[in-house]
C-alpha cells in the first residue's frame, strides 16, 4: 500500500521534478562556490526570473511548498529584466516556467470541477450564479493586480505613486463590497439547501459561503493563496498566448507558395 501524502507535498515533488531530477545533487555540490552565475545556470530559479516562483507565492500558507531548492537573487532578476528590455529572448526559461504553471493550473482546475460537482447545482442555477458573479471576478483580478503593482512601486522606492495607487485600491475594495452585496442578494435565492448556499472560487478552488460577511470574503480574495493563483493564471495565459503567436508566425513563414519580404 502506498503512503499518503499531502497535496502540497505532491505539488512540491512535481515542481522539483520539472526543475530537474538531479538539481538537489548539483546544488549541494556547488553551493559552497562563491561566484557569479550566468542566467542559464541550473541553480538559478527560472520561475523567479520570468514571473513568480510557486514556492514564494504560497510561502507561509497551508499550501506552502517549503523553500525553493534553487537560487532567488535580486541581481539575477534585474539582469534578466534588463536583457529582456534590450531585446534578448529566453524561450527555454519561459517553457520551464510554463510547464510548472501548467501543473498547478491543471490540478487546481481539476479540484474546482470536483468541488462544483459536489455542490450539484443544476445547469440553470450554475448559469445564473456565473452571470451575477462576473463583475465580482473582474474586480477581484483588478484588486490583485493593483496590490502587486503597489508592492513593486514600494520596492522601487516610488512611494508617492504607491500611495496614489493605494487610494485607488481602497476605492476598488469599496466598490467590490457594493457588488458583493448585490451578488449575495441574488445568489441567496438560488437553491434552498445548506449545501447550495456554498459556491466555489473558480480561481483557487476554495469553498465560499454566499452568507459570508464582506470582511470574510475580502480576507479570501486578498489572501495569499487566492492571489497566488491569480498571478499563476495570469502568467499562464500570457505565456500560452505568446506560444500561440510564435507558432502562428512560424507556420505563416513556412507556408508553400508564399513569398515574404
Swiss-Prot record:
Domain of life of the source: Eukaryota
Residues spanning the signal sequence: none
Location of the protein in the cell: Nucleus
Modified residues (N-acetylserine): 2
GO MF annotation, one: mRNA binding
Positions in coiled-coil regions: 123-190
GO CC annotation terms, alphabetical: commitment complex; cytosol; nucleus; spliceosomal complex; U1 snRNP; U2-type prespliceosome
Pfam family, one: LUC7
GO biological process, one term: mRNA splice site recognition
Alphabetized UniProt keyword annotations: Acetylation, Coiled coil, mRNA processing, mRNA splicing, Nucleus, Ribonucleoprotein, Spliceosome
Function: Component of the U1 snRNP particle, which recognizes and binds the 5'-splice site of pre-mRNA. Together with other non-snRNP factors, U1 snRNP forms the spliceosomal commitment complex, that targets pre-mRNA to the splicing pathway.
Subunit details: Component of the 18S U1 snRNP particle, a subcomplex of the spliceosome.
Alphabetized PANTHER family for the sequence: RNA-BINDING PROTEIN LUC7-RELATED
Family: Belongs to the Luc7 family.
Additional remark text: Present with 2270 molecules/cell in log phase SD medium.
Protein name, UniProt field: Protein LUC7
Lineage per the UniProt record: Eukaryota, Fungi, Dikarya, Ascomycota, Saccharomycotina
Gene that this sequence comes from: LUC7
Amino acid at each position: 500500500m502506498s503512503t499518503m501524502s499531502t497535496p502540497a507535498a505532491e505539488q512540491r515533488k512535481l515542481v522539483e521534478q520539472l526543475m530537474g531530477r538531479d538539481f538537489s545533487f548539483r546544488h549541494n555540490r556547488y553551493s559552497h562556490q562563491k561566484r557569479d552565475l550566468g542566467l542559464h545556470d541550473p541553480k538559478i530559479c527560472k520561475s523567479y526570473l520570468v514571473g513568480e516562483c510557486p514556492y514564494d507565492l504560497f510561502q507561509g500558507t497551508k499550501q506552502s511548498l517549503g523553500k525553493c531548492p534553487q537560487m532567488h537573487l535580486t541581481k539575477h532578476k534585474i539582469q534578466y529584466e534588463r536583457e529582456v528590455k534590450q531585446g534578448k529572448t529566453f524561450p527555454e526559461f519561459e517553457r520551464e516556467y510554463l510547464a510548472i504553471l501548467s501543473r498547478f493550473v491543471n490540478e487546481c482546475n481539476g479540484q474546482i470541477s470536483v468541488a462544483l460537482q459536489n455542490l450539484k447545482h443544476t445547469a440553470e442555477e450554475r448559469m445564473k450564479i456565473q452571470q451575477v458573479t462576473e463583475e465580482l471576478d473582474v474586480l477581484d483580478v483588478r484588486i490583485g493586480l493593483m496590490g502587486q503593482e503597489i508592492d513593486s512601486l514600494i520596492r522601487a522606492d516610488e512611494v508617492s505613486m504607491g500611495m496614489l495607487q493605494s487610494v485607488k485600491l481602497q476605492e476598488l475594495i469599496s466598490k467590490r463590497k457594493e457588488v458583493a452585496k448585490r451578488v449575495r442578494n441574488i445568489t441567496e435565492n438560488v437553491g434552498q439547501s445548506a449545501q447550495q448556499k456554498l459556491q466555489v472560487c473558480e480561481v483557487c478552488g476554495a469553498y465560499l459561503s454566499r452568507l459570508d460577511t464582506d470582511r470574510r470574503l475580502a480576507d479570501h480574495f486578498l489572501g495569499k493563496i487566492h492571489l497566488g493563483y491569480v498571478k499563476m493564471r495570469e502568467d499562464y495565459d500570457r505565456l500560452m498566448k505568446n506560444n500561440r503567436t510564435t507558432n502562428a508566425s512560424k507556420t505563416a513563414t513556412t507556408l508553400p507558395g508564399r513569398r515574404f519580404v
